Amino acid sequence: MEVLMAERANLVFHNKVIDGTAMKRLISRLINHFGMAYTSHILDQVKTLGFQQATATSISLGIDDLLTIPSKGWLVQDAEQQSLILEKHHHYGNVHAVEKLRQSIEIWYATSEYLRQEMNPNFRMTDPLNPVHIMSFSGARGNASQVHQLVGMRGLMSDPQGQMIDLPIQSNLREGLSLTEYIISCYGARKGVVDTAVRTSDAGYLTRRLVEVVQHIVVRRADCGTVRGVSVSPQNGMMPERILIQTLIGRVLADDIYIGPRCIATRNQNIGVGLVNRFITFRAQPISIRTPFTCRSTSWICRLCYGRSPTHGDLVELGEAVGIIAGQSIGEPGTQLTLRTFHTGGVFTGGTAEHVRAPSNGKIRFHEDLVHPTRTRHGHPAFLCSIDLYVTIESEDILHNVNIPPKSFLLVQNDQYVESEQVIAEIRAGTSTLNLKEKVRKHIYSDSDGEMHWSTDVYHAPEFTYGNVHLLSKTSHLWILLGEPCRSSLVSLSIHRDQDQKSAHSLFVKRRSISNLSETNDRARQKIFSAHFSGQKEDRIADYSDLNRIICTDHSNLVYPAILPILAENSDFLSNLLSKRRRNQFIIPLQSIQERKKELMPCSGISMKIPTNGIFCGNSIIAYFDDPRYRRMSSGSTKYGTLEMHSIVKKEDLIQYRGVREFRPKHQKKVDRFFFIPEEVHILPGSSSISIMVRNNSIIGVDTQITLNIRSRVGGLVRVEKKKKRIELKIFSGDIYFPGRADKISRHSGVLIPPGTRKTNEKESKKVKNWIYVQRITPSKKKFFVLVRPVVTYEIMDGITLATLFPPDLLQERDNVQLRVVNYILYGNGKPIRGISDTSIQLVRTCLVLNWNQDKKSSSSEAARASVVELRTNDLIRHFLRIDFVKSPISYIGKRNDPWGLGLLADNGLDWTNINPYSKARIQQTLNQNQGTIHTFLNRNKGCQSLSILSSSNCSRMDPVNGAKYHNVIQESIQEDPLIPIRNSLGPLGTSLPIANFYSFDRLLTHNQILVTNYLQLDNLKQPFQVLKLKYYLIAENGKIYNPNPRSKILLNPLNLNWYFLHHNYCAETSKIMSLGQFICENVFIAKKRPPLKSGQVILVQVDSVVIRSAKPYLATPGATVRGLYGETFYEGDTLVTFHYEKSRSGDITQGLPKVEQVLEVRSVDSISMNLERRVEGWNKCLTRILGIPWGFLIGAELTIAQSRISLVNKIQKVYRSQGVQIHNRHIEIIVRQITSNVLVSEDGMSNVFSPGELIRLLRAKRMGRALEEAICYRALLLGITKASLNTQSFISEASFQETARVLAKAALQGRIDWLKGLKENVVLGGVIPAGTGFRGLVHPSKQYNNLSLETTKKNLFEGGVRDILSHHRKLLDSSLSKKFHNTSHNTIHQTIIYRIYNDS
């Protein structure tokens, strides 16, 4: 007993946690020492002990064990503070969106990581035996990052595209997630349930493909006799010691190892732990080991090249199916790999920059000419040095020199005082490494509506010369000047002053308009009923956004209703005024609102009809009158009478709708009577079919319940029709007759019967008193009856003449103007008319048609321009419709009846709706505008008003559409220069006519492009803003005015203008600081003790105040593309800028299983094959230079295949190791050997054996070359595992994998033979598999292969470095081969890869 105690005392006692890795090591050492049987006993005891202890101690996990880290609160608060500052900088336009995204991700990632590091120390201090803490090292799901999500914070998540979502999840799972955090978390937490399911299937399929490639590889020989090996060097320290040991243990040496003269290990010796330790201790020369790559066999492997069996630690047995073991060793751990893409999402990797810190306090000095200013990735200012830069730091007693490498960012200024350890420079990481970058585009969208403006020059992207994509050449701001775009070009606003001229565009609209689509001529036309206009102040703009498309294309016109003639007490004044009119003007007075109330005729009397461009052609309708006698409240249909009885109008000559511009004779045919057949119609939604209480074809009385909330207004026959999404329920009033004979009825179906006709189908015949409409109803096949419906007859009378509409004195001097009255029927024959919610239906419309005598001599067509003039007398506002005749050469675009309206080009450039945007013709016109402008000057001193008319001589303009140059000629005011410098003037932006003084500045309206700015009188501005101006001109910071797209109309809200009142002391300096048109970023202080300004453009500078139009800055860096044109209107959500930035696509985007699969299928993006091709060329060039042509190709190709194999093994191992999965290299090597051992036969060689383009095994090609004694030309090829499975020697194996029919058909046509060498084909056919015990029955005793002596002929062809490159190949060419080789023609060898160095047999 004492002896035992003494022995035990000598044993080493380990007080350590044994994890999985340590357990593996323990078991392998036990097997080495005691063998398999004894080890299993020991392990049983360990198992029993473990279960006993676990039962005794048993930890439980409760929710209270999840202790949140105390420092979390202030860490998160700090990060939030940083994010807030970042957000402000973005708002002020100091950083752009990409920089903001990068910075915010870094802030939150750092916070999350810091919390994670805090976690373990916190547990150790507060509760070392906490179950959560104990479990956090158990591996699998119990690792630090899982626990971090429970007690730290969940952190940043990726979206499905792998982009980071920059909103971090601040809560942990213990605190619980908010709704937003939960949704984001669902994005990132794919790797939960879904991942596990997907991963299992993916890993299963990967295993299947791997096994398919290598199922035939079995250990068949003891030694293949190869002299080649792969060299592993313990000297250079490139490989970590752990990996070196893993690589070496279990292998077989390919060469003797010497230390000095002493041999410490011999060829074919098994490497154990002791030997490895000696190698590491002695730092031996590179060790050459045998691997599956070096084995000389074609379809099997030898014991020595495979090495030790992982199960029992001895050399592998003959007949072992090592291929299948390899496939499963790689495939099975696939389920442990994650499918996740790592946290970085690639946004800030490649940017973990190294920092240079100041060695001491002091002033920093450097050569300023060697650096130029730039921005860092986060948008901070910095200097970029393009060459090495020497920086000196002068402290009190010492000078420090710091060398900063090229392409680094200097973060301090010259002569700045720096403190010790302050970061002074950032070295760009990844300049030397080969990690690939991917280009990413990020679009920035507009936050608000407004006009685009940029403050720098841009140039067209070369591929978008005609598009609207511009590239920025330097860092600058893009501004969106806020304003609400008027989505329709039909309505505009003007500030309405006394005696101003108003064009037809600027009528105020008081109520929102309603839209009513009426069916006419089988084509939907748009009628817009808008409300009255007046000069009153409380005006709102009409909402036309929904009608915009229809109006623009269909060119229907706004209808301004209810303007009646004036019959007022002061008409003598008016006639005096109007009698002076010239020949080319025609003025119609209109009624004002005050008088309309006194009128007996209802409001909807005469409605004005003015085209959108204000231009009339001949024969236009200028007004219409809806006669109340032809108005119905109920639905029904119109009939023009039957063709038999009243053949007045042929069907195709039906009266057309009012929208035609010119009347052809057929439209003026008089219809002296028409008929209206009333019916009651209810349109119900399709879902309400259940609630209808009456049946189809039933007869009901008045006030019958039809549905739950509708009662019938008339009695009669019910018809229910189902349309697509609705139900039409009609009630026809009338009498029902059951006829005697069918033939009479057929004549009277759907016809109108005049009075006096006898009803023949009754016993006693009565005469019909009124018109009736006979309609045949067939409820079922056998039954039918006739419905006789009452008809309302309308006679059309020519009661209305011009004399009833206008005072006679106005109609005397009509000169060449003709007005005619024409009646229309608005609805076609038999068309159903639907009344919508008790609105009345107008059946006949009386139209006023304007025409004038055309001047036949002149070729140009004469057009009339309409405008509304307002005159105020005795505080009574009068409106006149003034029609001016202008002679103008009008350019027509395309065909006469093009789909965009009449194709007229408006002479004032405002009627853009008519321009056909697809027309290629150049449109050039010079228009002489005979339009006067009534304009008042307010002279405050005299207190009286004077009237001045700017006539057409004062404003003219040339407007070629493509040249877009504007010549502004306004007498005695402006030089002929389209860019007006106005930088230093007071007054609103865009004006250059100081009238009297700037207090009485008034609106000047001309048709000059630059001055058409409806500016407001400044006195009005100080009142609460109601309606602000229509259109601004953009002014650049250099003081030039740019006229933006004349189509755009911007309305400004009161919210968009900021009015700042300045103290009078600051006025003088303010006007210097602020020039008109200047852009101001937010947070600028204009005066002391004043609040900072909002960002915007200065549009008005006065003595005591400034008006700033709100604008939002967007920062853009060089290379960004700007969408849209200068001055273009942007709506909220439109793309403004696209940034192109690089993010590194290092190994962390695809991870885990997808990555392994990518490598094995050889289709990775940074594809190995690409690298290999480059590498081949590189090797070939270098070696050709060193060795001359034939040698170069020969050795280059061999090295390429060796390099690619090693590279593939390393890539696959890297993925598994990163996930903590250990796989022995030899398994991966067996797989890689299979996918790299195929070659493609080139065109020019071996034509008698292989066809060009055929895939053959590398060793087969070599053997064939030896047999035929000629050089073979082929290319090395990387096949993916799927392709390799479909290119094996066995067609049965291929057919059982994929594409069975194709493989078998091809094999039959080629006459392939399957030698049944692999396992799978034998399983398919039910034979004995050639592995394990089945292998011994196949092998016949033969002459031992490895008794052959190996000749080694040493030639000093290669010395030093080249010998290293060639991986210590023992056997080089003997002299006979080299002679043969040099005799081969020069051309054959060129550009071919020839594997003939090693004479293998």
Swiss-Prot record:
It catalyses: RNA(n) + a ribonucleoside 5'-triphosphate = RNA(n+1) + diphosphate. GO terms for cellular component: chloroplast; DNA-directed RNA polymerase complex; mitochondrion. Transmembrane segments: none annotated. Its EC number is 2.7.7.6. It is found in: Plastid, Chloroplast. Zn(2+) binds at C224, C295, C302, C305. Its main location: plastid. One of its GO terms (biological process) is DNA-templated transcription. CDD domains: RNAP_beta'_C (cd02655). Binds 1 Zn(2+) ion per subunit. Keywords: Chloroplast, DNA-directed RNA polymerase, Metal-binding, Nucleotidyltransferase, Plastid, Transcription, Transferase, Zinc. SUPFAM superfamilies: beta and beta-prime subunits of DNA dependent RNA-polymerase. It comes from the Eukaryota. GO terms for molecular function: DNA binding; DNA-directed RNA polymerase activity; zinc ion binding. Its cofactor is Zn(2+). In plastids the minimal PEP RNA polymerase catalytic core is composed of four subunits: alpha, beta, beta', and beta''. When a (nuclear-encoded) sigma factor is associated with the core the holoenzyme is formed, which can initiate transcription. DNA-dependent RNA polymerase catalyzes the transcription of DNA into RNA using the four ribonucleoside triphosphates as substrates. Belongs to the RNA polymerase beta' chain family. RpoC2 subfamily. This is DNA-directed RNA polymerase subunit beta''.
